[in-house]
């Protein structure tokens, strides 16, 4: 907005509404104002509701001569945690990546509803609840989730296509995410997995260092589920791994969980079900993968190929204004 010197711009909200709009004077000129909308981490009201505010132009001297402009948006939110400079989503993607209704929403976070972190929730939730979160992977550019199924005793992804020729990691980072979110970059994954202190042995509790922010120590804790079943098959030793930085103790750990990648018609069992392959934004096609056996499970740089299925974990796209 560029206002006459006699005018001012203000914002009005209905009672109880968050102050989600910010007015920023530009170039030191109080009459040249940029209006931006903000984001609230873990907003428990962000269920797609209509969020409204009024921009008011009026005379500075007495508030008369009001002009009102109503601004409306749909307020959606996903649960997040702050880790090494990134607002990571807590949960893997589910269903249609573009559809908020398919995702775990910050207004309906199952872990928060029972007063737990996600790491603790995955220990105590029912096998059915665990499987519902764990079973989703993606392939190509459709953004439509593939679900783990029992195919006559073979655990595989329903709808797997061995002829897929699109490398997910080379796609635009916003293509496979809902509005306001995106696929984290290789550099952002490196802040967590690119160890400068040796191999990250994921099957054990421990710690490792990365070079992010000079020198960052990341603590690791792991747990297993042995009570999950799909059809006739028992899915034993399903690992989920908590990682946290002591510099961010106000935020809960990030938790890695999910099914092994599938790269042919033989399914997702590779001696176990924990060879997770992550969707990473990398024009070079790089990525991160949990490789090895359950006696030696570790993270490696591996972008894999076009036929491989991947777990999707969103991050919040950068924003200029965060409100509480």
What are these regions (language model features)?
Residues 1-22:
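Extended low-complexity, serine/threonine- and proline-enriched intrinsically disordered segments
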Residues 15-16, 22-324:
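Conserved positions within compact, well-structured domain cores
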């Amino acid at each position: 907005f560029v206002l006459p010197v006699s005018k001012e711009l203000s914002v009005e909200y209905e009672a109880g509404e968050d102050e989600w709009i910010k007015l920023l004077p530009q170039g030191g000129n109080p009459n040249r104002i940029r209006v931006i909308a903000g984001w609230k981490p873990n907003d428990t009201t962000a269920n797609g509701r209509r969020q409204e505010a009024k921009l008011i132009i009026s005379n500075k001297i007495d508030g008369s001569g009001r002009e009102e402009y109503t601004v409306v948006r749909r307020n959606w939110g996903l649960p997040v945690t702050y880790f090494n400079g990134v607002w990571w989503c807590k949960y893997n993607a589910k269903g249609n990546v573009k559809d908020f209704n398919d995702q775990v929403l910050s207004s309906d976070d199952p872990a928060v509803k029972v007063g737990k972190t996600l790491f603790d929730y995955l220990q105590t939730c029912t096998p059915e609840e665990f499987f519902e979160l764990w079973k989703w992977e993606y392939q190509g550019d459709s953004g439509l989730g593939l679900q783990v199924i029992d195919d006559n005793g073979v655990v595989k992804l329903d709808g797997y296509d061995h002829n897929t020729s699109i490398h997910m990691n080379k796609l635009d980072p916003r293509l496979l995410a809902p509005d306001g979110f995106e696929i984290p970059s290789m550099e952002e994954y490196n802040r967590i997995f690119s160890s400068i202190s040796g191999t990250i042995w994921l099957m054990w509790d421990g710690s490792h260092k990365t070079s992010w922010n000079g020198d960052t120590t990341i603590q690791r804790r792991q747990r297993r589920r042995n009570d999950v079943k799909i059809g006739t098959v028992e899915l034993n030793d399903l690992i989920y791994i908590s990682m946290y930085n002591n510099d961010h103790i106000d935020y809960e750990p990030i938790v890695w969980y999910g099914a092994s990648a599938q790269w042919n018609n033989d399914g997702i069992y590779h001696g176990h079900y924990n060879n997770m392959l992550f969707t990473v934004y990398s024009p070079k096609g790089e990525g991160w993968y949990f490789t090895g056996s359950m006696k030696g499970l570790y993270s490696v740089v591996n972008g894999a190929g076009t036929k491989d299925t991947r777990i999707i974990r969103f991050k919040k796209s950068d924003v200029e204004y965060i409100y509480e």
